[in-house]
């Protein structure tokens, strides 16, 4: 080997293998096998080595890999990307298994032939795995051979040509009570006359062991097998090797003839790992079954397949590019035979012969068992019923082979893959490894690795703590190719339940996770009747292939990219977790109906989503409603009492569709179809908006228009006119409420009469007003105290911001006024506490916060008139019955404003010269009366100072008229603010709230006074009818008309 570096097989550490992983692996190896003098140990006690193509990336860094021949164990299971140099054509292989003598030479550690074989010179001619690694393993097992049964530790796959990387796949071995170990060397197919493998002289085994192996091989191997293998070797192409795993004896399964792949097929990698302490130490006996029937734990994650059977943890890895590289080594002769989906060969490789008979070797020998392969068939995994060990075998289903042809698309795809890199070969080492015992060190080591991988796996953290021994997963780096496969297809995890059923966890492409049950899934594959990804003819999906290459065939009714994992043909098994979804939908629907930790506004959110689960929830929710014998409008009112219909238009329509379906189910004879019910339901909703909406453009819809709009929409015919008239009158007389939540009902100003009569007024404060500015809306507190009431005649003198009111809106109107809280309500009828306020009454309401009431000295057309200037600078004139009543209203309004007006924020600062009046808060103050007085006093002092400063800088006479108007407007504002705060301070000093509680007798007397809203015209002064001259009229006009028109 030293002389031919180009042909030597190189084992190196993976670049991303951490130093800690390397040290742990070395320490473990030394613990299991002891230190080897002169060189580091080559073999792994639990995995062997693997030759994999360079484009394969290891996705499991926590398990280590084997290093270069003679350098020891590697701590990472990453597949190395370094390529091996090709070996010359004259390279020699290993003689195939032919009988007791030749079989021992080529497969076992036969001491006689090993000693007789040539040594290092022959090794230089053959590119073989380092024999030193085999020697180290034999030394470690020599003392344990007497125990009776052997265990597979390593299968060396020697191929004639190697163009890809050499990698070692490490498996953990529990050796505290380990009794046996078996070393199997696979057979390279490349020459007819192959010399025996020379082993070092250090290899020594006991004669009894050699004879035992000879006997078993003589009994199990036939001449036909050798002849067929030799025939395959004559193909002139260095075919790939079949890597086999240990199987149970022939008695447990029976002798079944199988057809294997022809030369050129490449074996797969099967890794086995013993469950901690659960594997029966005795192995599998030929005359009796052993172990207990265990549960099958199967995890598939696109590129990786992991199987735990019983006490064994059997892991089958299919890297993404693994099978593609296998295809590239196939010869043209094997194109037909290599078209079987690669995932069918879960643990054993494809055979080197075109028709090998499956031989189940004796368990004491534990030789690799041939796995069947076929060129056109589908395999079904068979569970061992007689044997307690949960070995899983692939058995040819001949009946299904005759029925199911191989699709042409698969032939074309695989042919393209074979022709892509024609002439290339691979070296693949497939370990078939089983352990019968555990030690404390290995148990702890496995537990640490399992928990670490579980923590980063797709399972939730609950899995790590609830069932740490029931799940296993690898930490998988999401490379772009893996991410693409995750997007294109789903992944599933299988767990074997107690009754033989397996829980299928489906992770769909959109992130949804559902749990189902399956009873016919074993090793990730279904039998002939049930198959994974069944689309049309049962065909198993092409696991581990390139992301762009798929063999899945879809049925006509299936959508491309479907994320359904299982389509069970048996009716009793629900696919994709439908049963669990229905149960969850029922539970959620019940909680929504009972409003269990849900608000009324939350219900529509769960019913109106556009997915299958939301539809299930809506269907279950509607089952709580019985609309039998009810009219459509009654059903709608009953339906909307349970929840609030809110959300987007399409979401609300989905809810109405579910309602229509339920109504038609309860009343199939009322309306012709479900579409007719839905159409009429939407028409009722639109009619309600038209008749009772806040914004009405044009006139409201009439009954005749409603009928005309629905002509011909009931399956081509008209609805009954009597039905439409009844619905129209019902909606017109009573508004249909569908978007009112519990809190909104409490805030609504139009409380029901029953609640008012019972005195159950809500304590929340809503806002009234139709302005677009929310700061100018009026706070409405139904529980506020009533300070004064009586008839008042009102005239609007100026609108908001002092703008002159149009002439048509300036007339006098009489109202029954009620000063309740900080709002002056103006009602058309006399005030009744139990009567609800109408919307018109609320529109006429006036807020008195930061307002000032004063006698209208500049208005003499009518007596007893006072002026009310609000915070938004509206000016209202009110006429009372008498001067005393006028003064009472002035005092009450000013007192309420002084006590309850909240301190304003400072005015905004800007560079504009234009004066802007600051907004004043409409909320009620939180200050006490003393603090309120101090606030008003400080504000009065500030306004006085600002007014004096403003008047100290009058505008120049040469400035523009606009600047003069701005100056006068600000002066008028400051003057008004000064007067207002002076009034507030004086009221609070006199008592404030005490003044509000006085004069109750006067308020009571006002209620009993005039019953007619009209005032006596005889009380008007006679001078009102006397015409004045021009000079007199000028004297009564404001001194600054331009300003007065804006502010008064």
UniProtKB/Swiss-Prot annotation:
It is found in: Cell membrane; Cell projection, Ruffle membrane; Postsynaptic density. Keywords: Cell membrane, Cell projection, Coiled coil, Guanine-nucleotide releasing factor, Membrane, Phosphoprotein, Synapse. Its main location: membrane. The keyword Disulfide bond does not apply. GO terms for cellular component: postsynaptic density; ruffle membrane. One of its GO terms (molecular function) is guanyl-nucleotide exchange factor activity. It comes from the Eukaryota. Pfam families: PH_9, Sec7. Residues 922-952 form a coiled coil. Residues 36-57, 104-126, 310-342, 364-383, 395-434, 741-769, 999-1048 are annotated as: Disordered. Isoform 2 is expressed in epididymis (at protein level). Residues 1011-1022 have a biased composition (Polar residues). Residues 36-45, 311-321, 397-423, 741-758, 1029-1039 have a biased composition (Basic and acidic residues). GO terms for biological process: regulation of ARF protein signal transduction. Residues 785-898 form the PH domain. The modification Phosphoserine is found at residues 76, 770, 1009, 1011-1012, 1014, 1020. The keyword Membrane applies. InterPro entries: PH-like_dom_sf, PH_9, PH_domain, Sec7_C_sf, Sec7_dom, Sec7_dom_sf. This is PH and SEC7 domain-containing protein 3. The gene is PSD3.
């Amino acid at each position: 080997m030293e002389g031919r570096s180009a042909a030597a097989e190189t084992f190196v550490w993976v670049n991303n293998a951490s130093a800690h992983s390397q040290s742990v692996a070395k320490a473990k190896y030394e613990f299991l096998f002891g230190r080897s003098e002169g060189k580091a140990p080559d073999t792994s006690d639990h995995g062997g080595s693997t030759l994999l193509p360079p484009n394969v990336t290891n996705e499991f860094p926590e398990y280590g890999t084997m290093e270069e021949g003679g350098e020891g164990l590697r701590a990472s299971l990453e597949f190395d990307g370094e390529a091996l140099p090709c070996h010359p054509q004259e390279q020699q292989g290993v003689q195939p298994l032919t009988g007791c003598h030749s079989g021992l030479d080529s497969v076992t550690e036969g001491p006689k032939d090993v000693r007789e074989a040539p040594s290092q010179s022959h090794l230089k001619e053959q590119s073989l795995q380092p024999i030193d690694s085999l020697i180290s393993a034999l030394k470690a097992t020599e003392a344990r051979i007497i125990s009776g049964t052997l265990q597979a530790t390593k299968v060396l796959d020697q191929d004639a040509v190697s163009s890809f990387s050499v990698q070692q796949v490490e498996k953990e071995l529990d050796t505290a009570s380990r009794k046996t170990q078996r070393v199997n060397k696979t057979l390279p197919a490349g020459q007819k006359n192959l010399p025996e493998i020379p082993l070092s002289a250090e290899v020594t085994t006991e004669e009894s062991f050699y004879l035992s192996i000879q006997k078993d091989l003589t009994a199990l191997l036939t001449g036909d097998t050798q002849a067929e293998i030799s025939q395959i070797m004559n193909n002139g192409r260095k075919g790939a090797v079949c890597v086999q795993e240990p199987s149970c004896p022939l008695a447990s399964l029976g002798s079944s003839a199988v057809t294997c792949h022809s030369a050129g097929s490449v074996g797969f990698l099967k890794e086995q790992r013993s469950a901690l302490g659960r594997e029966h130490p005795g192995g599998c006996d030929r005359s009796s079954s052993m172990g207990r029937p265990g549960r099958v734990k199967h995890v598939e994650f696109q590129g990786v397949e992991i199987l735990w059977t019983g006490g064994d943890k059997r892991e089958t890895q299919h890297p993404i590019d693994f099978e593609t590289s296998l295809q590239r080594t196939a010869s043209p002769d094997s194109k037909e035979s290599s078209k079987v989906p690669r995932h069918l060969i879960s643990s054993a490789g494809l055979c080197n012969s075109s028709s090998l008979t499956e031989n189940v070797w004796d368990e004491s020998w534990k030789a690799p068992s041939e796995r069947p392969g076929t060129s056109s068939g589908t395999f079904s995994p068979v569970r061992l019923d007689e044997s307690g060990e949960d070995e899983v075998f692939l058995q040819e289903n001949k009946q299904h082979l005759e029925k199911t042809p191989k699709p042409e698309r698969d032939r074309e795809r695989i042919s393209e893959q074979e022709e892509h890199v024609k002439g290339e070969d691979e070296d693949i080492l497939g370990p078939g490894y089983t352990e019968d015992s555990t030690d404390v060190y290995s148990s702890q080591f496995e537990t640490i690795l399992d928990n670490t991988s579980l923590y980063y796996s797709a399972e939730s953290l609950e899995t790590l703590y609830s069932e740490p021994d029931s799940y296993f997963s690898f930490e998988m780096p999401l490379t772009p190719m893996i991410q693409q496969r995750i997007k294109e297809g789903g992944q599933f995890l299988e767990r074997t339940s107690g009754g033989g059923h397996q829980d299928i966890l489906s992770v769909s492409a959109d992130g949804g996770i559902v749990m189902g049950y399956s009873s016919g899934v074993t090793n990730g594959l279904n039998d002939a009747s049930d198959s994974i990804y069944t689309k049309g003819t049962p065909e198993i999906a092409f696991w581990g292939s390139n992301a762009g290459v798929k063999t899945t065939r879809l049925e006509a009714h299936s959508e491309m990219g479907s994320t359904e994992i299982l389509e069970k043909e048996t009716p009793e098994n629900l696919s994709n977790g439908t049963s669990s979804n229905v149960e969850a939908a029922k539970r959620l629907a019940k909680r929504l109906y009972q409003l269990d930790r849900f608000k009324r506004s939350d219900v529509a959110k769960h019913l109106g989503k556009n997915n299958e689960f939301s539809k299930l929830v809506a269907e279950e929710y509607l089952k709580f409603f019985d609309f039998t014998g009810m009219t459509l409008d009654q059903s709608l009112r009953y339906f909307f009492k349970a929840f609030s219909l809110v959300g987007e238009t399409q979401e609300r329509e989905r809810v109405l569709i579910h309602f229509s379906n339920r109504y038609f189910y309860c009343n199939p004879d009322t309306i012709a179809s479900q579409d007719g019910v839905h159409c009429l339901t939407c028409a009722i909703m639109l009619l309600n908006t038209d008749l009772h909406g806040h914004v009405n453009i044009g006139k409201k819809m009439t009954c005749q228009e409603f009928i005309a709009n629905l002509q011909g929409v009931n399956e081509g015919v008209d609805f009954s006119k009597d039905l439409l008239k009844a619905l129209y009158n019902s909606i017109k007389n009573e508004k249909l409420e569908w978007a009112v939540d519990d809190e909104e009902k409490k805030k609504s100003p139009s409380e029901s009469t029953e609640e008012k009569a019972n005195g159950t007024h809500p304590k929340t404060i809503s806002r009234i007003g139709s302005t677009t500015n929310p700061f100018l809306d009026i706070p409405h507190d139904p529980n506020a105290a009533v300070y004064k009431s009586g008839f008042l005649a009102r005239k609007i003198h100026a609108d908001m911001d002092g703008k002159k009111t149009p002439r048509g809106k300036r007339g006098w109107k009489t109202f029954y006024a009620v000063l309740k809280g900080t709002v002056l309500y103006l009602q058309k009828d006399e005030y009744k506490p139990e009567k609800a306020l109408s919307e018109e009454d609320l529109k006429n309401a006036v807020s008195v916060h930061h307002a000032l009431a004063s006698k209208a000295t500049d208005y003499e057309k009518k007596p007893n008139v006072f002026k009310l200037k609000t915070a938004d600078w509206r000016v209202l004139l009110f006429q009372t019955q008498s001067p005393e009543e006028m003064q009472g209203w002035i005092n009450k309004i000013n007192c309420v404003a002084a006590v309850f007006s909240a301190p304003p924020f400072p005015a905004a600062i800007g560079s504009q010269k234009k004066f802007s009046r600051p907004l004043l808060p409409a909320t009620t103050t939180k200050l006490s009366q003393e603090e309120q007085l101090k606030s008003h006093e400080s504000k009065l002092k500030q306004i006085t100072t600002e007014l004096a400063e403003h008047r100290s800088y009058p505008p120049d006479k040469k400035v523009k008229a606009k600047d003069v108007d701005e100056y006068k407007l600000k002066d008028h504002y400051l003057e008004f603010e000064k007067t207002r705060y002076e009034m507030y301070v004086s009221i609070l000093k006199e008592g404030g709230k005490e003044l509000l509680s006085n004069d109750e007798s006067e308020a009571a007397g006002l209620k009993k006074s005039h019953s007619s809203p009209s005032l006596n015209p005889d009380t008007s002064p006679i001078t009102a009818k006397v015409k004045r001259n021009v000079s007199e009229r000028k004297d009564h006009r404001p001194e600054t008309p331009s300003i007065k028109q804006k502010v008064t």
